[in-house]
Amino acid sequence: MAASELYTKFARVWIPDPEEVWKSAELLKDYKPGDKVLLLHLEEGKDLEYHLDPKTKELPHLRNPDILVGENDLTALSYLHEPAVLHNLRVRFIDSKLIYTYCGIVLVAINPYEQLPIYGEDIINAYSGQNMGDMDPHIFAVAEEAYKQMARDERNQSIIVSGESGAGKTVSAKYAMRYFATVSGSASEANVEEKVLASNPIMESIGNAKTTRNDNSSRFGKYIEIGFDKRYRIIGANMRTYLLEKSRVVFQAEEERNYHIFYQLCASAKLPEFKMLRLGNADNFNYTKQGGSPVIEGVDDAKEMAHTRQACTLLGISESHQMGIFRILAGILHLGNVGFTSRDADSCTIPPKHEPLCIFCELMGVDYEEMCHWLCHRKLATATETYIKPISKLQATNARDALAKHIYAKLFNWIVDNVNQALHSAVKQHSFIGVLDIYGFETFEINSFEQFCINYANEKLQQQFNMHVFKLEQEEYMKEQIPWTLIDFYDNQPCINLIESKLGILDLLDEECKMPKGTDDTWAQKLYNTHLNKCALFEKPRLSNKAFIIQHFADKVEYQCEGFLEKNKDTVFEEQIKVLKSSKFKMLPELFQDDEKAISPTSATSSGRTPLTRTPAKPTKGRPGQMAKEHKKTVGHQFRNSLHLLMETLNATTPHYVRCIKPNDFKFPFTFDEKRAVQQLRACGVLETIRISAAGFPSRWTYQEFFSRYRVLMKQKDVLSDRKQTCKNVLEKLILDKDKYQFGKTKIFFRAGQVAYLEKLRADKLRAACIRIQKTIRGWLLRKKYLRMRKAAITMQRYVRGYQARCYAKFLRRTKAATIIQKYWRMYVVRRRYKIRRAATIVLQSYLRGFLARNRYRKILREHKAVIIQKRVRGWLARTHYKRSMHAIIYLQCCFRRMMAKRELKKLKIEARSVERYKKLHIGMENKIMQLQRKVDEQNKDYKCLVEKLTNLEGIYNSETEKLRSDLERLQLSEEEAKVATGRVLSLQEEIAKLRKDLEQTRSEKKCIEEHADRYKQETEQLVSNLKEENTLLKQEKEALNHRIVQQAKEMTETMEKKLVEETKQLELDLNDERLRYQNLLNEFSRLEERYDDLKEEMTLMVHVPKPGHKRTDSTHSSNESEYIFSSEIAEMEDIPSRTEEPSEKKVPLDMSLFLKLQKRVTELEQEKQVMQDELDRKEEQVLRSKAKEEERPQIRGAELEYESLKRQELESENKKLKNELNELRKALSEKSAPEVTAPGAPAYRVLMEQLTSVSEELDVRKEEVLILRSQLVSQKEAIQPKDDKNTMTDSTILLEDVQKMKDKGEIAQAYIGLKETNRSSALDYHELNEDGELWLVYEGLKQANRLLESQLQSQKRSHENEAEALRGEIQSLKEENNRQQQLLAQNLQLPPEARIEASLQHEITRLTNENLDLMEQLEKQDKTVRKLKKQLKVFAKKIGELEVGQMENISPGQIIDEPIRPVNIPRKEKDFQGMLEYKKEDEQKLVKNLILELKPRGVAVNLIPGLPAYILFMCVRHADYLNDDQKVRSLLTSTINSIKKVLKKRGDDFETVSFWLSNTCRFLHCLKQYSGEEGFMKHNTSRQNEHCLTNFDLAEYRQVLSDLAIQIYQQLVRVLENILQPMIVSGMLEHETIQGVSGVKPTGLRKRTSSIADEGTYTLDSILRQLNSFHSVMCQHGMDPELIKQVVKQMFYIIGAITLNNLLLRKDMCSWSKGMQIRYNVSQLEEWLRDKNLMNSGAKETLEPLIQAAQLLQVKKKTDDDAEAICSMCNALTTAQIVKVLNLYTPVNEFEERVSVSFIRTIQMRLRDRKDSPQLLMDAKHIFPVTFPFNPSSLALETIQIPASLGLGFISRV
């Protein structure tokens, strides 16, 4: 489109600025073609005329719309150019505090110079498994993308981290490796992950140093390959290093340090093991004191040394090798102190017994004389002879330094090799991810060989980067099938050819190094001759013949030739190396094993007059000329080869790029220097990426996104059903130039600037629509208002005018009369007013004059005092000003003298350089020194600033520490007060009980007290009549006091209630914490078990040929055998096989440190588990004891009577029900039988009816007989053992209870018939006392009645004794109260009248308070009674239901109809089952296999009763308990537990399986409790169920084991739930638009476009709800406890809320008003689901509260202070960090909405600064709430359970 359409009035542009690089401005008028000047308005308020370049006529860059500013991806910007990139980075870095930004495939990381809480485990978990484009930019996102692509594409990956020194490369690489270590394995064990991370401290100590730009600068490049196995777990690593800066060993610039390891050694010199090294302060050594900055602020070198040694130990470097390393490093320091003395110009010597050299030789184990000789001489070899030549002092010093550098380089390589060996794994590497931490493009004022190599490496990397970006762009275009046009991008291959091709710079440098007399000057001339004017990228400086310029991809760089040859040759004298090789110190020769080939014999360099010593040359073996050919490889050649290998590796991998940016040179946190940032953006290739993107189609929209966003630009007739065609039609009308866009298969591609143009059209359309709507509505409203006002005005005018006329006439009449009256009245009023005012004025004047006089006095006094103060202050100010002026003058004098000294120094330097040889040697040193001096000054300033900041931070830290310490003490005091309060509550309860006892005594003596009161009243009546007025006042005071007492009592009650609630909550929290800790330990234990299994499998795989006869049981069996055995003898017997297996295990290659650590950890866990188990048992006993005490409290007599009557009514109703059921059976038989059988005249019918009638008659007769016999027995017992009638129950109640007892055992009719049949079958049975056994039946009934009566009498006796004791206590308390009252009366009679009245009032107050407390106690007692009665009613209702079910089961119509042909008999119970299952011991494995291992949960859950496997297992345990078979019980339980573990390990990812076994494990646990025989668990049992209790074994220990197993299964269930729900949550809760059309769509960047995972079908909220329904139905189907289902649902909702909120906090595109509305709607749907399932009280809704508040935060207004206050009060479930993060990320979808201002966010932070919450940003999505398993007894009778044939358990039988 034309420029005139874009450059219109109010359009915003960027113009160049020398200070800010780019400055924003706004057009004041439209641009027209041909204009030479643009009228601009700057943001600071100035107007500017911007002149266009007359040659290029280029217009300034357009600025992106505000809606695009702050995007995650720079390629999402519509206008892609340098100012847009710079502004976007600045907004994100400064305003939003976001340090990461995508630029296409590049992650741009800006160093914040501040610790940020964005690298924790929670952030790693949040990014794990996510697509890169879905989350906010982060180094973890790049690492996750690499990890995911490695697993998906089976291709190795690389992460290339580059940037300037101090930009954060090393930290970024470190966090990437930490991410891999966390997601690919457990980082808490001493395995490869820890070793990979442990290599960092070692490499930092030997390869990092302090520079002027960075305190921890890496002085080498490294490429770390992290190896993974087939399961993508870290198995090892390998490190390659590049271009170590060896010169730093011997030389450091000002304010810089040598490598950290030297200073760490010096700081640790006082350690005993380091005494032999003879080290001291770092200032004592030449190699560590040159920089003058031996200490780094905030770094403790001694502690760092300890970390380094610890890392070496972890990596397997032995103590002897560590000491060897330290010996060599100490030797290097002592070597640097070796001094030389000149004998003449060409020779030197070392003083005899020179101490530094002696120490060096002693540490290195070499001969002193030999080393002394070769440090001052060198050997020159020719073809025939060898010469030994002395060297000058300068040459000797250089040789010494070269030797030190060589030793350090060899030691560095040796350490790297050992680290690689430690990281190497025997397991075959399947794939790897490489992390390249390499120096970025460098340019300084003086650039040398190091900068040349660094920039050469960056040229190669930039070429590879350009090709990769180009390839990705091409793939995207081809994938979308759009016309492919070649993008023109910078190709730096010519620059690379200039450096590395034949006769290139490196080639000429190597050739010059081979020349005998080669120098830097000759090499420079060769460069000029070869490349000058032939290569456009090579230039020569105008004023120098010893430098050259290369045009790199980032900038032109001028290199000084001086030192190139020396650094490239890296010459070390061979004789010195031979001396070191002959060392007695074994480690030293290892460093030089490869030097025979590497070091060449030195050749003669000059033919001076130096005296030579001739020796015959030794003949060389092999071919002639071999020695001449075996030249040492130069540094440049080695670097080129290693760089080629690196590029081959990178080209074979998929690269990922991280570009680190240094925002400022002063290390100020969150300070952005635009100039420095632009330099680095140009150097690191970010702008090149932008240029490549801008050359193509950077903006890309799907058709649906485009339609949703720009629907407002379409007319109704343009909208078709085909979205693609609709978009095409609209675009052709909106953008006429078809080259500006392309239509792909799924996306529309736009050129740069087109999206901004479309946004402008959209905004204009919306703005015009808004204006039109506003215009119409305002016009209509105003016209309507005008017509209404006009009508009202006319009406009002009519009435007002008439009224005014009438009033005017009346006015005229009254005016005359009023005038006369007024005349006289005014005179009177004026006269009166005058008198009053005169009198008042006189009074006022008197007071005012006195007041003014006093004020004047005080003013004079104040002025006098002020003059004295001013005198003192002015004197002090004058003295202060004088001192400051003197200080400034002295400072100026110092500066001037320093300047003069510098000038003098400069003159001296000029004079010193007059000597020609000195000039050659030290050319260029002056400039360098001046430059370094300036840098030193700047560094000093920075250092002072940092010191001040550090002091402030230390002060803040100390204050915070004190504050936290005071808080801790306060909490401890509150805890002690809570304990004291608990004790007080107990004592108060005892006092209350005592007062209750005293109450009755007080009542009995009440009459006596009343008599005393009457007498007292008579005596006081006369006194009261005399003091009536005073009495009235006292009554008022009394009422006030009463009111106050009531109020205080109320407040006290409320306070106590609040305290009780708080203490209860605190106890619950403590219990939950303890439970969570215990369950976490269980989880850790199970994880260690799994780890042990994995290690065992690996060991098994590593053993190729197993020995015969060696067999290993499963780990789960062995672990449980050793842990859960309750029989010590059997445990000892079964431990024997495991002991015999130990020697075979030792032969397997295993990391013993890992094994011992695991063993120790397991032991600790077992001990902690035992302690926690004891605590849990103790707490449970306390709870049971308290419950028992509550139940044993004597009930009120009335409640007991009601209870007995209720039981009697229940039994009567049950009897009626039995009769009704019998009648119903008759009716059903008559209705449902076949016509021929059930007809009234049918024979079968008659027989059946006759039998039923006879049975019912017999039953009635037997009942009467039983009643008579029992009554006789009771009377006999009364005669023998007489009891008090009050303690016995009525006979009718006893008999009814006996009937009930018999009903509990079985139906009376069936019992009778069963006995009758038994008597018929065995005539000789001793039970047969008469014909049909009636007497035996009666005898059994009487025995049971006798037992029942005895138990009831004992209980009545106990209750009677308790009641008598209580009455005695009350009598005693009443007596005491009576005595106290008498004493009070006696005292009151002796008091004067006033005191007597006061005492009586006090007494009355005390009496009322006591009565109030008594009433409250009675109320509480009645409430408890009501609650207990309600509970009993529920129990009886449940029993009635069970009896009804039992009756229906025992007498069913089906039993009668089964055999219609033969005569119908009454169904009889052939056998009375005892609820046990019998099996043989050899069938145990078959039982476990069929019931657990091979059981399919789905078939069991659908067709059989819930929990059937648990019931079967328990019935088997009951039978083993019945047999008293210890071993069988133990074996069955252990096999059951191990089999469940095995099933869950095999099918642990299947929700149905885990849910099924969780339900059955809990049911099994409940059965063990229900039938344990313990009173606390037997309350809800029937008498029949109580008969099924275990008799021989106490399985409490196994209950704990099963509880632990249930906890582990629950945690596994939660993990399965999380794995299933996690892919759905983000898509369903955040991304899917549940409310269509609410949220707009914004343009996306390259990351969002090129996700590593293709869309697999989006999930919606309905998907989540369907999945929740599925989970709920499965759990209900499996019969899971309702309380457990609630806990599972609560955990599910917590996972949904946590993951949704975490993604919201990490995704800027989700933080908008419309998205808040979507989230709130989705949450309401989840709440509706909870209501439908009756789970609102499960606590699940509360877990969504943080998400709800985050959604509300997105929707509320965010401008004023009131809004800030509302936000702070509303968001109490969010932490301060989360609130601030949401506000920072808030992004308007439309440009009409304003962003959240920085001032508003600061206001929020100020208001929340006192809030004490977690600083953690993300919620812990892995958190699992502690689970509890409330006891849930089963009403199912064990004897009724049938074993289905489908289970294949025919080998077990019911007993």
Swiss-Prot record:
CDD domains attached to this UniProt entry: IQCD, Myo5a_CBD, MYSc_Myo5
Domain Dilute: where? 1534-1810
* Reactions the enzyme catalyzes: ATP + H2O = ADP + phosphate + H(+)
SUPFAM superfamilies hit by this protein:
P-loop containing nucleoside triphosphate hydrolases
Chain intervals for the UniProt region annotation (Actin-binding): 643-665
**Which Pfam families does the record match to this protein?**
DIL, IQ, Myosin_head
Stretch list, region Disordered: 598-631
Q: Where does ATP bind?
A: 163-170
| InterPro entries recorded | Dilute_dom, IQ_motif_EF-hand-BS, Kinesin_motor_dom_sf, Myo5a_CBD, Myosin_head_motor_dom-like, Myosin_N, MYSc_Myo5, P-loop_NTPase
What residues bear Phosphothreonine in this entry?
1032, 1760
Every Myosin N-terminal SH3-like domain range: 8-60
Instruction: Share an example GO biological-process annotation for this protein.
Output: melanosome transport
Q: Which UniProt keywords apply?
A: Acetylation, Actin-binding, ATP-binding, Calmodulin-binding, Coiled coil, Motor protein, Myosin, Nucleotide-binding, Phosphoprotein, Protein transport, Repeat, Transport
Q: Which residues form a coiled coil?
A: 914-1237, 1338-1445
The Myosin motor domain extends over 69-763
Record PTM Phosphoserine, positions in chain: 600, 1452, 1652
The family annotation for this protein states: Belongs to the TRAFAC class myosin-kinesin ATPase superfamily. Myosin family.
Q: Subunit notes for this chain?
A: May be a homodimer, which associates with multiple calmodulin or myosin light chains. Interacts with RIPL2, the interaction is required for its role in dendrite formation. Interacts with MLPH. Interacts with SYTL4. Interacts with MYRIP. Interacts with RAB10; mediates the transport to the plasma membrane of SLC2A4/GLUT4 storage vesicles. Interacts with FMR1; this interaction occurs in association with polyribosome.
User: What's the protein here called?
Assistant: Unconventional myosin-Va
Q: Which organism is it from?
A: Homo sapiens
Q: Organism classification, top ranks?
A: Eukaryota, Metazoa, Chordata, Craniata, Vertebrata
Identify the coding gene. Answer: MYO5A
